[in-house]
């Protein structure tokens, strides 16, 4: 046999810790959407029309249990932070899992939080030990969260095409 199977349950897991699982019953994973490259293009109106705000993918039965409808703003909270995202209710995700793409809002660059602390999934992730013992990475995926319906979107973000303006930061000469 060339390869030996290896699996290690994540440090935060409903399988490992019942107390945490009760408080944070969902597992967060994250990835990328095809409209943006790393942290770029969120200032381009055409791209924001395609993917205007961060979305959280939620399985329909889970959304219903939390009183969340498609398009509702949702609080997403881990042990490390709390952000908001818009609900995308879909059968394209497992019932115990939610998924988000990292996001920031360049239109709020002049605010105290520079437009990322309200909606960026990285606020929720872990960057301290224990690390993945095989490759030494931080836990950027597979950590526990809870969700609840939010009253509104974060203040000052573009949500509709008529809000979008091409924006380019200008450096000082």
Regions found by a protein language model. Name each.
Residues 1-44:
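Long, low-complexity segments enriched in small/aliphatic residues
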Residues 39-57, 61-173:
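Long, contiguous, secondary-structure-rich segments that constitute the structural scaffold
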């Amino acid at each position: 046999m060339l390869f030996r199977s290896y699996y290690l349950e994540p440090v935060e897991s409903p399988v490992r810790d019942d107390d945490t699982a009760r408080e944070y019953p969902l597992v967060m994973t994250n990835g990328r959407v095809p409209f943006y490259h790393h942290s770029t293009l969120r200032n381009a109106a055409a791209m924001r029309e395609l993917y205007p705000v961060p979305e959280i993918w939620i399985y329909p039965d889970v959304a219903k249990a939390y009183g969340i409808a498609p398009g509702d703003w949702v609080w997403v909270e881990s042990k490390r932070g709390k952000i908001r995202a818009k609900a995308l209710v879909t059968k394209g995700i497992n019932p115990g899992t939610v998924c988000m793409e990292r996001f920031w809002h360049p239109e709020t660059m002049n605010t105290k939080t520079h437009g990322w602390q309200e909606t960026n999934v990285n606020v929720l992730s872990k960057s301290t030990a224990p690390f993945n013992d095989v490759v030494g990475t931080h836990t950027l995926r597979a950590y526990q969260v809870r969700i609840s319906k939010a009253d509104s979107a974060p203040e000052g973000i573009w949500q509709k095409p008529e809000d979008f303006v091409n924006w380019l930061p200008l450096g000082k000469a």
